[in-house]
Regions:
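Surface-exposed cleft-lining segments at the edges of enzyme active sites
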Residues: 2-6, 107-117, 170-175
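Short alpha-helix
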Residues: 168-190
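Conserved S-adenosyl-L-methionine
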Residues: 190-201
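Well-ordered, non-membrane alpha-helical segments in soluble/globular domains
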Residues: 12-17, 47-54, 178-181
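Active-site beta-strand termini and strand-to-loop segments that position acidic
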Residues: 204-205
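Conserved SAM-binding loop
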Residues: 29-142
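Conserved class I S-adenosyl-L-methionine
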Residues: 132-159
């Protein structure tokens, strides 16, 4: 296992432990996981190199109470996780009625949905369909950018960072919109607790 994958898995274990401790789900708790991937834990990581996809789906004790939402058609996801309901849809326009779930969970998705307007819509939708939310995102002020594995480049102005990504063959990183603690908090219209775990920020309502 690569060191970066080991760090990622450790981070996700920490977030899962925090999720279980803060949300205290029980067997009857309904959970929506927004932004799942078609590939599963340990499979190829695509552009980001990440091999820790769908960590909640792999570890959650009551999969029958999970609903997963993703952009893909879900064929491989359903094969891998037959006990979990899968819905294809847009995280910024969720196809569910108000208060459909006890908890909305999303791990490191909000930085991929677009700029601040789309990110605000993402938060609004999570708050609309969930009685509580648990959202995570990489911390912009951590010195290593988790998607590219590059140090400090993401602290540059976006135009300069974009050029640097182009030079090293990571132009796809231009589409990542990272958040610092104040940025993350500003997306919530009401009370929210922002936990700074160093590498990761967690928003809890």
């Amino acid at each position: 296992m690569r060191l970066t994958d080991a760090i990622s898995i450790r981070s996700r274990r920490r977030k899962l432990a925090l999720f279980l401790d803060e949300m205290r789900p029980a067997e009857a708790t309904t959970v929506l996981d927004v932004g799942v991937d078609e590939v599963s834990l340990g499979e190829g990581g695509g552009q980001s190199g990440c091999t820790t996809h769908n960590f909640l789906e792999e570890r959650y004790p009551w999969p029958e109470r999970l609903t997963a939402l993703g952009l893909h058609d879900g064929t491989r996801f359903r094969e891998r996780y037959p006990r979990i309901a899968y819905v294809q849809g847009d995280a910024c326009s969720l196809p569910f009625p108000d208060a459909s779930f006890d908890v909305v969970h999303s791990n490191a998705v909000i930085e991929h949905v677009g700029g601040r307007e789309r990110q605000a819509a993402f938060v609004d939708e999570a708050l609309r369909v969930g009685r509580r939310v648990f959202l995570t995102t990489p911390n912009r002020w951590f010195p290593v950018e988790v998607h590219t594995r590059l140090p400090l480049v993401h602290w540059l102005p976006e135009s300069l960072a974009g050029r640097a990504y182009d030079v090293v063959g990571k132009s796809w990183a231009r589409d990542n919109h990272l958040l610092g603690p104040a940025d993350f908090r500003s997306l919530f219209p009401g009370a929210v607790e922002i936990r700074n775990l160093g590498l990761t920020l967690v928003a809890i309502t």
